[in-house]
Amino acid sequence: MTSPQDRPEVSARRQFLRTFLHDLATPLSAVSLHLEGANRRLQRGDDPGESLEIARTELARAFDLFEQGRELLLAQPSTKETFLFDDWVERAAHGLGADDVRIEGSTGGKVAGDRSKLDEALSALLVNAVESKEIVSMVLEKRDGRLQVHIENRGLLPTDDPERLFAPRSSGPGKNWGMGLARARLFAADAGGVVRLAQYGDRVVATLELPEERG
């Protein structure tokens, strides 16, 4: 039997909280450093304006990140809904209005969870793939009582630590990384699922996996 602490949603929230607090500490540390710099300039009779402006910018970033993370951590679970997995994936792909998305395979299964949150999770993965400007393929698969959608596009993940793309402050040119992927992982975990990123040759594969709903 799985203990409460080992459940996907608990593990995902714990991981998010660790990363969130680390990312929040980074701009706050910068605020402290620049305020100290402003004080030293002031004591020398110099203009502290530049240091104060940088401190203000970092403080605004920290506050924005804090509000987003707080909202996410305090969000209450909503009504559980059961729906067809394949239809859900197809609607999400068509909803983007992208012509270069190909869907292969089928599962014939159902999943259950907060549909609006799962919509957001799948959308975050799709948007990242579509923004790569390459042809995107989606492969549906059923394995060991789990339903999976693999979203593939040409591209490269960071070779040092792909997991940092799930960090709330992570970002990239034209990418919806960061809080979008962090939210996707949390929302999938709330439904007993997982979100993974992997590199296969010259292609990035984002996988959203959910337990099949029986009956």
Please annotate each region the language model reported.
Residues L33-H34, G49-A98:
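Conserved DHp (HisKA) dimerization/phosphotransfer helix of two-component histidine kinases, i.e.
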Residues T19, T26, A30, S171-G172:
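Residue-level recognition of the "H+4" position in the DHp/HisKA helix
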Residues A30-G45:
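Conserved C-terminal segment of the DHp
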Residues I135-R146:
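Short beta-strand/loop element within the Bergerat-fold HATPase_c
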Residues E134, G192-G193:
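Conserved glycine-rich
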Residues R102-K110:
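Conserved catalytic submotifs in the C-terminal HATPase_c
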Residues L157-R169:
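Short conserved segment of the HATPase_c
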